Amino acid sequence: MSIGGVYELAFCRSSLKSKKYFIILLALAAIAGLGTHAAWSSNGLPRIDNKTLARLAQQHPVVVLFRHAERCDRSTNQCLSDKTGITVKGTQDARELGNAFSADIPDFDLYSSNTVRTIQSATWFSAGKKLTVDKRLLQCGNEIYSAIKDLQSKAPDKNIVIFTHNHCLTYIAKNKRDATFKPDYLDGLVMHVEKGKVYLDGEFGNAANLLI
């Protein structure tokens, strides 16, 4: 079976029950260890790097949610500007992540919650790309699923990048996979929408940071 076929089975067949779905993900991990850039996190979530994400995006549009970059008010590093925003180091980290991401996923719509730190993170992640600020992305219960589905319905064939907050990502991982996820700055989750439902595919991580 081709790699693309495995990803199609693992991520696109929403009718699979959770146990069978987990078995398929285990098979995916085994195959990934032989030649793809995928691995498993200690929390049990599949880890997906930008190369694997690009292949996944060929199967269906993806939704990637990132935590914002380093906060100014919780760091001794130099602030970019506003104390409620991010640090200069945070801008550099966001730009580096954005360059690597855009090299493999160049076409996506960009959103952020309505805080200075998420807006700055999104702006530095993708300089020049139109950013849409949506206050619903600050709400981290079931409301965030409604927001994701609404954004995806506006452009069903487009990939989406969202800058949000650690408690949102923690909630999604626990709610969708019963996984304990404590994201660091610029950590992310990969999701997709299928037939009106939102699915969590795994944790996003750069290839250099994955243990294969």
UniProtKB/Swiss-Prot annotation:
Biological processes annotated in GO: lipopolysaccharide metabolic process
InterPro entries for this protein: His_Pase_superF_clade-1, His_PPase_superfam, LipoPS_heptP_Pase
Keyword annotations of the record: Hydrolase, Periplasm, Signal
Protein name, as recorded: Lipopolysaccharide core heptose(II)-phosphate phosphatase
Record-linked HAMAP family: Ais (MF_01868)
Cellular component, GO, one term: periplasmic space
Organism lineage string: Bacteria, Pseudomonadati, Pseudomonadota, Gammaproteobacteria, Enterobacterales
Primary localization class, coarse: periplasm
Family according to the record: Belongs to the phosphoglycerate mutase family. Ais subfamily.
GO molecular function: phosphatase activity
Pathway: Bacterial outer membrane biogenesis; lipopolysaccharide metabolism
Position of the signal peptide: 1-32
Organism of provenance: Shigella boydii serotype 4 (strain Sb227)
Any single Pfam family the record assigns to this protein: His_Phos_1
Enzyme Commission no: 3.1.3.-
Class of the enzyme per the UniProt entry, highest EC level: hydrolase
Function comment: Catalyzes the dephosphorylation of heptose(II) of the outer membrane lipopolysaccharide core.
Subcellular location: Periplasm
Highest taxon listed in the record's lineage: Bacteria
